Amino acid sequence: MRRTFSQLATRLLKSKDDELKSTLKYLTKGPVKLLGPLFESSEVNEQGSLLNRSRTKENNLQNHHIENILRILNSNLPEVESKKQKVAVHYDVLFSHLNSIVTQATDNKSSSSKELQGSSSEDLYDRLLLLQYVGKLTNVRQITEILLSKKFNKFDKVWEHRALFDEYQRVVISILLYYRTHDVQIRKDYEPRWLSDYSDLPFPLRRLLWRCLTSNVSEDNIRQNIIHYIKLLGANWRNNDLILIYQSLYEKSHILPDLTVLNHNKDDGFSFTQNQILLVRILRAISKCVEEEPKLVKKWLIDIVKLSIQSKIMLESPKKPSTPIMDQYKFIRSLDISIRSIHRTCQDKLIFEDLQVNLGSVLKMINEEEHELKTHLPLNLI
């Protein structure tokens, strides 16, 4: 302690303050026991003063030196307020730069789907969290593009930090993660929410959900499984969703519930538009041949499903016009072209003989529907 205060000698001796010099002399030459009060609490000092009332004068002198010592020590402390201001300015600048980096990194315009496909799993995971932190994770498509990316594999991390997302986002994430991992616990925890929130899910996610609900279900039981979930959905179910199921499970169309299975719902009936009936009939006929030439037949199915999605066939209703007549006509013309192409291919292959016959009947239905739609088109468009 004496050595510590002696180091201040040069500074103090240059001072004209005689009191400081006196204090330094008191510390360097006085008995060690006199230093004790410097490290005692005020309570201890008060107790000492009570026990040594006879030494009041000496204690006053000692306290005077203590005040001088404290003044010396405090004079060597940094200027806290000015330092705090400098640190605050530093962090303001730092976070301003960070905000700029994050904004640029999460800008939807600068991050196309192709760029996401080239990102690593770690980059995709970081992007998902960044979007959420800055409040830019605003739609299902953003989550879907990341979690369904072929390179993404941070499934456990996302599930571990699911509390960072709101309730609806967690439902979306649970569907996507179950689709990728088939984690039984995820389905056990969230299947009730999948059904209760079904009507709030966008169509692409509903299609994915039906793949989840029918995963690990044998072909013999898939029809009954779907009917079971239709009943569980209750008021959330719409008959048009059966078209969506066909779009989702197109490879198994021939074993899915037929359109007439919905006649139990008297309020909604089981009526479908002619385009919807054609779509289901085509998918059921073609899907029977998947095992014959899987690659070719799957391509046919995918092309037809894509066409039906682009034309929004699911939204058509026999009760009221829900799709512009021109869109319906475009679909039937495109469908005619696709089916004729498939029909020509079947002519050269014996294994597709039955399919060729079925598609021949379908082409007749397509022609009839095309003529019917033409009667509703403006003359200048015919």
Swiss-Prot record:
Q: In its keyword annotation, does this UniProt entry include Transit peptide?
A: yes
Keyword field: Mitochondrion, Transit peptide
The record's subcellular location field reads: Mitochondrion
The residues forming the transit peptide are: 1-12
Q: Which GO terms describe its cellular component?
A: mitochondrion
What remark does the entry add?
Answer: Present with 981 molecules/cell in log phase SD medium.
Q: How does it assemble?
A: Associates with the mitochondrial ribosome.
Q: What is the stated purpose of this protein?
A: Component of MIOREX complexes, large expressome-like assemblies of ribosomes with factors involved in all the steps of post-transcriptional gene expression.
Can you say what this protein is called?
MIOREX complex component 5
Q: Which organism is it from?
A: Saccharomyces cerevisiae (strain ATCC 204508 / S288c)
